[in-house]
Amino acid sequence: FQHPKMNIWRENFKGIEYRHPETGLLVSGAVDDIWVNDKEELHIVDYKSTSKDEKIEALDKDWHDGYKQQMETYQWLFRRNGFKVSDTGYFVYANASKDREAFDAKLEFDVTVIPYKGDDSWLEPTLLDIKETLESDELPAVAQDCDYCTYREFVGRKLQRFAPGKKKGQGTLGI
């Protein structure tokens, strides 16, 4: 895909941006690549690399959900910037081989292209929820299976010793 801003869109901490009018939130993301199909639709492409024993052929693990949300956010950003974007994006997964005798100054990869049909319909309501949470004086309830909530509670307990005069719940992070 040829576009004058392509290098900016690939750059971390710049990327493609969109200010959400209903919330005023600035959403941005740095895309890895963009392919174009015969219908002139853009396909968002995200490169991933790892070194796992098993062959990667699908994004079917719980921790892949973040990858999918990232793809859908990129699709949403390009749509909001006026581009015709296909629902299908691609993950190009490079899995470094572990079974070589020696590296000999090079890594060998098995590369798999994984199509993914994105659905960015969750993004608008999520931005509204984020705005509401940011403007609230209350922390959201801890979710049962949320790794971030567990981390927040752990950090809160550690930080409590720096605020000994405050009762639990009187500060940020739930401390």
Segment roles from a protein language model:
Residues 2, 69-70, 75, 144, ...:
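Residue-identity detector for glutamine
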